[in-house]
Swiss-Prot record:
Name of the encoding gene: DRP4C
Functional note: Putative microtubule-associated force-producing protein, able to bind and hydrolyze GTP.
Species the sequence originates in: Arabidopsis thaliana
Domain Dynamin-type G, residue spans: 62-323
Coiled-coil intervals: none
G2 motif: annotated span: 97-99
Region (G5 motif): 273
Protein's name in the database: Dynamin-related protein 4C
One GO CC annotation: cytoplasm
Length: 669
């Protein structure tokens, strides 16, 4: 007697595989309606729990369930395998027979009468064994249309029958590359996309149906499963039509060129009018007596072995995944409840709306206080534009540098002073500088810079307006219906403050024209230092005509003096003195302008945050002449209403899912 060769794959470390008893063992499981009795009574509660979660559509919450996904190329014999497992007839014909995901729930029953029904589109349609194929076709036409197209909307088939294995499988359309008989041009893309969606999750077990008549390495279903399961840890292969291509089959399943870690099961398809019991008997006879097929290890042949393996794999996967599923359900439920609680309550009265508005403005005020006054930007750690005290300091520093930058000399040295003195002369003692002359040249200096402070203050308030808009938008995010009103109110407030600030800045600048005064001792120190070279300068201009045309003056560098030799000393002396006075005093003026603007800015910002913001925004929002912002809060925006409904539906689904798994988790604790 020839000793059989073993063609069994080594078991996956994570999923146990059952061994069938020897063919010589008299106690081998009897062949019932289609196959065998259930693995044990623990499978059914686990499977019912997962099926309950599947019916609840918990997958739409991003929670993947342990699923046996049946895939195969067109005409691979996929339908025959499922028929043999369930003991029922599925739609047959040319082209794609399965056009929607068919969720097959097989449940062992002690009743002699089978119960079969379909579920789709929230409907339950009872049927029987004789009419099941017809009922599936009719349901498929409702879901996917009466043509040849496919749909990803599932159809659930319940089979409660004596002798069936406790299994839930998802049968997907067979893979076809070339559209025929009115199929859509992108039929391959539609089917492959549907298959990838089901087999990609790590919780999916891939039942890959392969025909013994083809080279496994060329099968499209193998190529697709290897994309998501490169090592084959989640893939079990069923080799159909073993009786049609027995030669080389042993080598195929032994060599395992396509890396199927969960192993192979070789089966014989039901032929013609055979009953399922006759088909199983013929299958057992084939693998026991065929000169080639009998060499294949008995642990990997036959529909009963396939059913047993699938049940064990399924129960192991469910037991392994259930704690993770429970954890994900709890996590997503907590997140959904938290998100729902963050949404604004539905306003029932103007009083409630006003209170909500005060909360929005109050929280915005606190944010503005932190970022504009206290320098606390913890609320916006990564948004440097919202680090307001730093940005205001930057703008003030840039303004100071720009204001105090040394202007380019247009007139020749002392010529402006000489012209002013000439125009301001009067009958009186010589060598006295008329105050009017000093104020005249001071006014010229002020006129030269008067636009810069106004530009600076406008820039400051434009920036603060952007900040205020960002803060109020964030705080009123749950009330989009009033965001435009709050933004307009904020813009109006900043516009008023900006106008007041510009007027104040213009006053500060104008004051510098009217009075030449400072108590800063630096003025006298600087003037004394600069005038110390006056005598040598006058001598160089008036007495020493042979010296070079340039003279070094402290604070001015080398200045041209040849153009001054036509003037008398009694004019040059006051001109030089006034030049040194205005230069020393002008530095004081510029610093004073910067200081005054800095102090005024700080005062204005604090006034905005502490007093004006809340008072004026609320006043404008409650004024019916401005659109009645408070009344708008009574109308929940479509966006928030949609978000609320979605969260409420998610919470309902997740709570039901939590209840569904609670009992089974308690039993397994």
């Amino acid at each position: 007697m020839v000793k059989k060769k073993v063609a069994t794959k080594k078991n996956s470390p994570s999923l146990a595989i059952a061994k069938k008893k020897s063919r010589s063992n008299k106690d081998v499981v009897s062949v019932e309606a289609p196959i065998i009795s259930s693995y044990n009574d623990r499978i059914r509660p686990l499977l019912d729990t997962v099926d309950r979660l599947r019916n609840l559509n918990v997958m739409r919450e991003g929670i993947h369930l342990p699923t046996i996904v049946v895939v195969g190329d067109q005409s691979s014999g996929k339908s025959s395998v499922l028929e043999s497992l369930a003991g029922i007839s599925l739609p047959r014909g040319q082209g794609i027979c399965t056009r929607v995901p068919l969720v097959m729930r097989l449940q062992r029953s002690s009743s002699p009468e089978p119960e079969i029904w379909l579920e789709y589109n929230d409907k339950v349609v009872p049927t029987d064994e004789e009419h099941i194929a017809e009922a599936i076709r009719a349901a498929t036409d409702v879901i996917a249309g009466s043509g040849k197209g496919v749909s990803d909307a599932p159809l659930t088939l319940h089979v409660k029958k004596a002798g069936v294995p406790d299994l839930t499988m998802v049968d997907l359309p067979g893979i076809t590359r070339v559209p025929v008989n009115g199929q859509p041009e992108n039929i391959y893309e539609q089917i492959s996309g549907m298959i990838m969606e089901y087999i990609e999750p790590q919780e999916s077990i891939i039942l890959n149906v392969l025909s013994a008549t083809v080279d496994f390495t060329t099968c499209e279903s193998i190529r697709m499963s290897r994309k998501v399961d490169k090592t084959g840890q989640r893939t079990l292969a069923v080799v159909t039509k073993a009786d049609m291509a027995p030669e080389g089959l042993l080598q195929k399943v032994t060599a395992d060129d396509v890396s199927i870690v969960l192993g192979y099961v070789c089966v014989r398809n039901r032929i013609g009018e055979e009953t399922y019991e006759e088909a199983r008997m013929q299958e057992e006879l084939l693998f026991r007596t065929h000169p080639v097929l009998s060499l294949i290890d008995e642990d990997i042949v036959g529909i009963p072995v396939l059913a047993q393996k699938l049940m064990l794999i399924q129960s192991s996967m469910i037991a392994r995944c259930l704690p993770k599923i429970v954890s994900k359900i709890n996590q997503k439920l907590d997140t959904a409840v938290l998100e729902l609680n963050k949404l604004p309550m539905v306003m029932a009265s103007t009083g409630e709306a006003l209170m909500a508005l005060m909360d929005i403005i109050g929280s915005a005020k606190e944010s503005l206080l932190r970022i504009l006054v206290q320098g606390d930007f913890s609320e916006y750690p990564d948004d440097q534009n919202m680090h307001c005290t730093a940005r205001l300091a930057d703008m003030l520093s840039q303004f100071s540098d720009s204001l105090q930058a040394k202007p380019k000399e247009v007139a020749e040295f002392l010529m402006d002073e000489i012209k002013i003195l000439d125009e301001c002369k009067c009958v009186g003692l010589p060598n006295f500088i008329p105050r009017s002359a000093f104020l005249a040249i001071l006014s010229q200096h002020v006129d030269g810079i008067q636009d810069k402070p106004v530009e600076f203050i406008n820039k400051i308030w434009d920036y603060i307006e952007d900040v205020l808009s960002s803060v109020t938008a964030k705080r009123s995010d749950n009330f989009p219906q009033i965001q435009s009103s709050i933004k307009r109110a904020g813009r109006n407030l900043i516009s008023k403050i900006k106008e007041q600030s510009v007027n104040r800045v213009m006053e500060i600048v104008e004051m510098e024209k009217l009075t030449d005064y400072t108590c800063n001792p630096e003025y006298m120190t600087s003037w004394t230092q600069k005038t110390s070279a006056q005598e040598s300068f006058i001598d160089a201009v008036v007495k020493n005509e042979n010296i070079p045309d340039y003279f070094s003056v402290t604070g001015f560098g080398n200045v041209k003096i040849s153009h001054l030799r036509k003037y008398h000393a009694h004019l040059l002396i006051p001109a030089f003195d006034m030049k040194m006075r205005i230069t020393s005093y002008w530095k004081i003026v510029l610093r004073r302008i910067v200081d005054n603007l800095a102090l005024y800015l700080q005062l204005s910002v604090k006034s905005l945050v502490n007093t004006r913001f809340q008072k004026e925004i609320v006043a404008e929002m409650v004024d019916p002449r401005d659109g009645g912002g408070v009344e708008k809060m009574l109308e929940e925006s479509p966006l928030v209403a949609s978000k609320r409904e979605k969260l409420q539906n998610s919470i309902k689904l997740l709570k039901e899912s939590k209840d569904a798994v609670a009992a089974i988790v308690d039993q397994n604790c």
